[in-house]
Amino acid sequence: MNYVGLIIVLSCLWLGSNASDPDDPLLVQLPQGKLRGRDNGSYYSYESIPYAEPPTGDLRFEAPEPYKQKWSDIFDATKTPVACLQWDQFTPGANKLVGEEDCLTVSIYKPKNSKRSTFPVVAHIHGGAFMFGAAWQNGHENVMREGKFILVKISYRLGPLGFASTGDRDLPGNYGLKDQRLALKWIKQNIASFGGEPQNVLLIGHSAGGASVHLQMLREDFGQLAKAAFSFSGNALDPWVVQKGARGRAFELGRNVGCESAEDSASLKKCLKSKSASELVTAVRKFLIFSYVPFAPFSPVLEPSDAPDAILTQDPREVIKSGKFGQVPWAVSYVTEDGGYNAALLLKERKSGIVIDDLNDRWLELAPYFLFYRDTKTKKDMDDYSRKIKEDYLGNQKFDIESYSELQRLFTDILFKNSTQESLDLHRKYGKSPAYAYVYDNPAEKGIAQVLANRTDYDFGTVHGDDYFLIFENFVREVEMRPDEEIISRNFINMLADFASSDNGVLKYGECAFKNNVGSEKFQLLAIYIDGCQNRQHVEFP
């Protein structure tokens, strides 16, 4: 057994003898001391529990350090988790700065269920393009109402504070991913004290959270931290996830905040540490050339092999091909119009017309930023590719509301669907554990596309989050679930509960059992729609 495994086993044994007080379930004993949560009627909550030392001062742009402080008084675990400092896409107005730099916490939600003394655990990584988002933005009322598992929400560093990188050991990047991994270790070591089953941990996430799940799974020892993984509308091969050009952006960040004299990575890092966190994060706006485009200017990178605490040193494709990754059951999904998240802002109206009109003159300029190939090709190759994909999807049509649906399909394919298919293809060829997939088609009355376009008179189809927000409530919905959505919500929640506790990696949705893709000649895809589900085989994703 390696060192990580030994520490986890010993911690779980210690915590098993120091569980919550049966006479006072709100009081929980941890190695740091005691904490007190909140009784919410149908469930208990224990929020804002630190798992790492504050990533401030000398610890900024460093791998996270486990939380070491001891509590002399009972820790107050009733405070809503703060967002990590970010330039938030969904905050209205010119100033989009929200959150705090000291933010590395987990929040735990435990259902009241007299039929169970312990629960499987679902650990959740929120989305937000690695730039924004927060644990509190994903609700838990639906999950707690079903009472099937303990939910743990993970907060992690975002934007430049989480992902700025010069590509060398001085400023390797991926601090947000390292936060997530440390949080997973904390969960494994401590969740038994809350009535969780450390042997039954499922890691899930949506969008950048889903990609994070996949990236965590690429660590060969992932199976010591979780028994299964689920990536909703996001995976490690999406073009906006592991990006090139990070070194140039790191030095550009430095120039934007007064570190233009930095000649190397070490001096740049020292200068960036001397600046205020708000100044660094506010500088994100200098990287946005059009609304919130590109939506992920800072994201995961490939680290050098000599970087301290490196978490990703090889292209994810090569890791999967090697077979040296966490061989646990994995599921991945997409919705039929995921790209609506990225395209919908183009239908926003203004005095001079619709935003999409700008593409007729600026497509060659903007396409590489929308679709994340700005650092992968020469200028000529970028222009040629931009012209080709426009012709492939729109033909001779100009950019306008009539051709918008084809543009949204282009965004869906390039940013989500094609890479989901590629990921599943690699897992079915090189994986040993089950690999599952579903496609969802059931439009919400209001979703993320309507919010970004600020209009409800256009049928965007089933857009990014229309499935996931039936599990975790989100501010973009604002409407009650329809009867069909209530059924789908319960099916999704039961699906996660069963996946977390399954001993053989079986995955079911309602009456439909997912089919394993490993070794299959055709893709085994579960289609989920308004009134049911159906297993389908495809040579290529529909």
Swiss-Prot record:
Glycans are attached at N40, N418, N454. It is an enzyme of class 3 (hydrolase). The active site is at S207, H464. PROSITE patterns: CARBOXYLESTERASE_B_1 (PS00122), CARBOXYLESTERASE_B_2 (PS00941). GO terms for biological process: courtship behavior; pheromone biosynthetic process; response to odorant. The keyword Transferase does not apply. Disulfide bonds join C84-C103, C259-C271, C512-C533. It catalyses: a carboxylic ester + H2O = an alcohol + a carboxylate + H(+). Transferred from the ejaculatory bulbs of males to the female genitals upon copulation, plays an important role in the reproductive biology. Belongs to the type-B carboxylesterase/lipase family. Monomer. This is Esterase 6. It comes from Drosophila simulans (Fruit fly). The gene is Est-6.
